Regions:
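Nucleotide-activated donor-binding/catalytic signature segment of Leloir-type glycosyltransferases, i.e.
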Residues: 282-287, 291-294, 299-328
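Membrane-proximal helix-turn-helix segments that form the acceptor-binding/catalytic region
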Residues: 31, 114-126, 132, 150-170, ...
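Helix-loop-beta element that forms the nucleotide-linked donor phosphate-binding surface
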Residues: 165-166, 171-172, 177-226
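N-terminal subdomain of nucleotide-sugar transferases
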Residues: 1-64, 278, 282, 367, ...
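Nucleotide-sugar-dependent
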Residues: 262-265, 320-329, 336-354, 364-372
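An aromatic- and histidine-rich active-site surface loop
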Residues: 23, 50, 85-92, 102-127, ...
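Conserved donor-binding/catalytic core segment of Leloir-type glycosyltransferases
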Residues: 216-228, 234-262, 268-272, 291
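A charged, aromatic-enriched C-terminal amphipathic alpha-helix characteristic of glycosyltransferases
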Residues: 384-387, 401-448
């Protein structure tokens, strides 16, 4: 069931100045708009493949922009930045001009430069409703690599404030961000829309876990068992039954961008402590297999550091997981770790949302907005430093898997995660986001099948 105007589907444009495949929230917007009777033009850059549901939807058009020339990388850093921004501004503006005419445009921020001024100007000259989906502040991300008082950071902040106030309305990812937008910049017309996990993130059967472990064992020996139908975690009997091994190791999973704003050294030192504790008390702690997904500039540094340690009780692997296997991995794990530390302190990590959707408890590093998602000792664990993470891991896995104390102690975790999973994206979107689009289109609304 959806909304339809003037006996036809109204056009909406979604803009993200980034890889469309790495923009899950914008993919979700597109799917919900299509379900509610809109034609959607999703504008961004090519890269990883968008969600299969988006690719199959006949009412969603993907418009890819031409990336900036690689030659810009040979220029001095500041000049390269300005040239890239100029290129993106021109490409984005002409892409919008040549796209189907829309009644509403929703852009993702960040990045806000040049997206905000370009989208605002386009909406002015075409009389299009201008909406912003605030995921974070771009200037705080820029300040990570520069400094808080750098001129470019000031300009970025000024741009977000000026053009953010010109929007007709918008969405944001946390209550903390909504309050901050109002108090700091006087931006009032913003509605909170929390991220929710996609349907592909869900609990799985023991057989599905076994199939994943068998697949991983062909590449990573730490998963291999002592017979062809056995892994260190599971075993398939001749009659087809799959059981968990009584002496199985624990499986820890983390997804990281391998950048400075996700400090992997925190997990590295916690694992080093765990190695020592397991060596000293082998009867009380299981071996640990750690799967770290993602790619980034510091990946090679830390993988080399792990290799140098030659740990005997902790195995760390960094596989590239397909879009199909990643949700299965989360659902097969015993604990997730999130190292995301928000540059503004106001956004929430999508990776935790996905883990919760998979019924996986998470240990996450603390920052101001995090308790809006992770409730300490209710659906997850919050730590502030490497020492606290080390203690959490040791507490969580003590006696694992033979003793049931952990499962009994954290029974409420799984009950609360089941409650979290009941609240789906589209009903939340319909309540909080759909009215913004309905206000932006003309004509009498009616329900249509």
């Amino acid at each position: 069931m959806g909304y339809q105007r003037d006996k036809k589907r109204e056009q909406v444009t979604l803009v993200v100045l980034g890889d469309l495949g790495h923009s899950p929230r914008m993919n979700y917007h597109a799917l919900s708009l299509s379900e509610e009777g809109f034609e959607v033009n999703l504008v961004g850059f090519a890269g990883s493949k968008p969600q299969i549901e988006v690719l199959k939807d006949e009412h969603i058009t993907l418009t890819y922009m031409r990336p900036s020339p690689a030659a810009f990388g040979n220029l001095p850093r500041v000049l390269a930045y300005f040239m890239k921004v100029l290129w993106q501004a021109i490409i984005l503006f002409f892409t919008l001009l040549t796209s189907p005419r829309s009644k509403v445009l929703l852009m993702q921020n960040p990045p806000g430069i040049p997206t905000m001024p370009v989208c605002w100007f386009f909406c002015i000259i075409t009389r299009t409703k201008f909406l912003i989906d605030w995921h974070n502040y771009g200037y705080t991300i820029m300040a990570i690599n520069l400094r808080q008082n750098h001129p470019l950071v000031f300009v970025y902040s000024l741009c977000e404030r000026i053009f953010g106030k010109q929007a007709h309305g918008g969405l944001c990812v946390t209550k903390a961000m909504k309050i901050n937008l109002a108090q700091k910049w006087g931006i009032q017309k913003v509605t909170v829309l929390y991220d929710r996990p996609a349907d592909r993130f869900h609990p799985i059967s023991l057989e599905e876990k076994h199939n994943l472990f068998m697949k991983l064992s062909t590449t990573y020996s730490c998963f291999s068992g002592s017979s062809p139908d056995k892994t260190v975690f599971t075993e398939r009997y001749a009659d087809g039954r799959v059981i968990e091994c009584e002496d199985r190791p624990a499986l820890l999973v983390s997804s990281t961008s391998w950048t400075e704003d996700e400090d992997f050294s925190i997990l590295f030192h916690a694992l080093e402590d765990y190695e020592g504790v397991r060596h000293e008390f082998p009867d009380h702690y299981p071996p640990l297999i750690v799967v770290v997904t993602g790619k980034g500039p510091m990946k090679e540094y830390y993988t080399s550091l792990v290799a140098e340690r030659m740990w005997m009780h902790v195995a760390v692997i960094t596989p590239w997981m397909t879009a199909e296997d990643y949700p299965t991995l989360l659902a097969a794990a015993d604990l997730g770790v999130c190292l995301h530390y928000s540059s503004s302190g106001l956004d929430l990590p999508m990776k935790v949302v996905d883990m919760f959707g998979s019924r996986l408890p998470v240990a996450a590093i603390d920052y101001p907005a995090l308790p809006e998602l992770v409730k300490h000792n209710e659906n997850g664990l919050i730590f502030k430093n490497k020492e606290e993470l080390a203690n959490l891991l040791q507490d969580w896995f003590r006696g694992f898997p033979r003793e049931t104390a952990i499962k009994e102690t954290y029974y409420d975790f799984y009950k609360n995660l089941d409650e979290f999973r009941k609240l789906k994206w589209h009903p939340c979107w319909t309540c909080n986001a759909l009215p913004l689009f309905l206000d932006g289109v003309s004509g009498q609304q009616r329900l249509t099948n």
